[in-house]
Swiss-Prot record:
Catalytic reactions of this protein: tRNA(Glu) + L-glutamate + ATP = L-glutamyl-tRNA(Glu) + AMP + diphosphate
Presence of keyword Nuclease: no
Chief subcellular location: cytoplasm
Motif ('HIGH' region): 8-18
Quaternary assembly: Monomer.
Keywords: Aminoacyl-tRNA synthetase, ATP-binding, Cytoplasm, Ligase, Nucleotide-binding, Protein biosynthesis
Source lineage: Bacteria, Thermotogati, Thermotogota, Thermotogae, Thermotogales
GO BP terms: glutamyl-tRNA aminoacylation
Source organism of this protein record: Thermosipho melanesiensis (strain DSM 12029 / CIP 104789 / BI429)
PANTHER family cross-referenced by the UniProt entry: GLUTAMATE--TRNA LIGASE, GLUTAMATE--TRNA LIGASE, MITOCHONDRIAL-RELATED
Residues at which ATP binds: K230
Purpose of the protein: Catalyzes the attachment of glutamate to tRNA(Glu) in a two-step reaction: glutamate is first activated by ATP to form Glu-AMP and then transferred to the acceptor end of tRNA(Glu).
Protein name: Glutamate--tRNA ligase 2
Location in the cell: Cytoplasm
Short motif ('KMSKS' region): ranges: 227-231
Length: 462
């Protein structure tokens, strides 16, 4: 049976590179009716935390990468945390020692002072580890689905530690033991693990176990062509979630980062049947923040308005933004429809829509300086109030005609009149279309806001 795993270390938030690796594992498992397993590699006792484990699982869940077995739901080959599998590693290490394929090594500081196949009791006060014995005369070969046949000469490898002095396994030993007993058929991971693979193959061979099929995926880079890291900007799934990126948009972007597919904008779950590892690029790709934001905007505009409002409310709750919107009201739908055309993220949607949902909006400094403190602003607002009080039909064409009549009657620049009214209604100069905004606000809100702004203008000494 096809079985793939994603095995994060709970030492930080889920990196988008890790999320892409999880996605490719998930896609392959789903396409072949296999199993996708989550395993927590928490043998770094100093840095691993339960909090990060929870956040990693939450990020995967938010992305929609559901798993079939894992630390939270169990399964037939658990436990699914390495810290709960120490006895298994100890048993296998002892098997290697018994067969003289590994040995105890004693260290005094950084110096190895003793080796033996028997536990060195007389060195209890020293650091005692278990090291794997490399057969220097051999070569280690394996097939990589992306890179083809790989061959490494063992003479370039030193004996390496498999059990640390604290009794915990090293990474290279633990993953071999876990992947074997968890019956993992394929290991898809970043190419930064390629140098680890020969050591792991040596352990498989020593134990007489069949190794899984490997695929090492090129890394995601920053714009300076170095591995994507915090110095390039936010890199975690949580960062993008809190920035207002939709889960489906992030999945979509991660999928096209290296996977050649016949279209750019799509729902990843509808593409499961088309996934083919042979269409994954063997070259590293650069993470483009602007491209992701653009792609997110496309997803926002393609969503049913009801679904977008639900996601928007989830985002407001996540950020603790105080904006009470009722998704059942047509007014809410109308606001979101005109606002989403101007933005690419939920964060931007909050900024541009805020003034529609509250009368307690503030005027941005730019509007106050350029318009609110100008002498002619009072005349423009009075004329607008007079004109809109007379207007019966609050449709776009009538609203546009009314505004252009104000410009004509006052013999002022269109921009001056329109921006004065725009800022009066919404407190800012960048908004959805003015005609559309007035139509959505309706007569009552429009007049109330114009009068409020006029009252404020009168308090300025102009």
């Amino acid at each position: 049976m096809i079985r793939l795993r994603f095995a994060p270390s709970p030492t930080g938030l889920l990196h988008v590179g890790g999320a892409r690796t999880a996605l490719f594992n998930w896609l392959y498992a789903k396409k072949h009716n296999g199993k996708f397993i989550i395993r927590i590699e928490d043998t770094d006792t100093e840095r691993s935390t339960k909090e990060y484990e929870t956040k990693i699982l939450s990020a995967l869940e938010w992305l929609g990468l559901n798993w079939d077995e894992g630390p939270d739901i169990g399964g037939g080959v658990g436990p699914y945390r390495q810290s709960e599998r120490l006895h298994i590693y100890q048993d296998i290490a002892q098997k290697l020692i018994n067969e003289k394929l590994a040995y105890y090594a004693v260290y005094d500081g950084e110096n190895e002072i003793h080796r033996s196949f028997e536990y060195p009791k007389k060195f209890k006060d020293k650091s005692i580890v278990v090291k794997f014995k490399v057969v220097k005369e051999d070569k280690t070969n394996f097939h990589d689905l992306l890179k083809g046949e790989m061959s490494f000469e063992n003479k370039f490898f030193n004996d390496f530690i498999i059990i640390k002095s604290n009794g915990f396994p090293t990474y290279n030993f633990a993953v071999v033991v876990d992947d074997h007993f968890m019956k993992i058929s394929h290991v898809f991971r970043g190419e930064d693990h390629l140098s680890n693979t020969p050591k792991q193959i040596m352990i498989y061979n020593a134990l007489g176990w069949k190794n899984p099929t490997f695929m090492h995926i090129p890394l995601i880079l920053g714009n300076d062509k170095t591995p994507l890291s915090k110095r390039h900007g936010g890199t975690s799934v949580d960062f993008f979630k809190e920035s207002g990126i939709l889960n489906n948009a992030l999945l979509n972007y991660l999928a096209i980062l290296g996977w050649h597919v016949d279209e750019e904008i799509f729902n990843v779950k509808k593409k499961i049947h088309t996934f083919d590892y042979r269409n994954i690029s063997n070259k590293s790709v650069v993470f483009d923040y602007k491209k992701l934001e653009w792609l997110n905007g496309q997803h926002m505009r393609n969503l049913d308005i009801e679904e977008l409002i639900i996601k928007f409310k989830e985002f407001l709750k996540l950020k603790n933004y105080n904006l009470n919107i009722d998704e059942t009201l047509e007014y809410t739908k109308d606001v979101i429809i005109i606002c989403r055309e101007k933005v690419n993220t939920l964060s931007q949607l909050f900024e541009i829509s805020f003034s529609f949902f509250t009368e307690e909006y503030n005027y941005e400094e730019n509007y106050i300086k350029k318009f609110l403190k100008k002498k002619e602003t009072g005349d423009i607002l009075r004329k607008a109030i007079e004109s809109f009080e007379k207007l019966e039909n609050y449709e776009i064409s009538s609203i546009e005609n009314t505004l252009r009549k104000i410009v004509e009657d006052m013999n002022l620049a269109t921009k001056k009149v329109f921006q004065t009214i725009r800022g009066a209604l919404l407190g800012k100069l960048v908004t959805p279309g003015l005609f559309e905004s007035i139509e959505v606000l309706g007569k009552e809100k429009t007049l109330k806001r114009l009068k409020k702004t006029l009252d404020i203008w009168e308090k300025y000494e102009v």
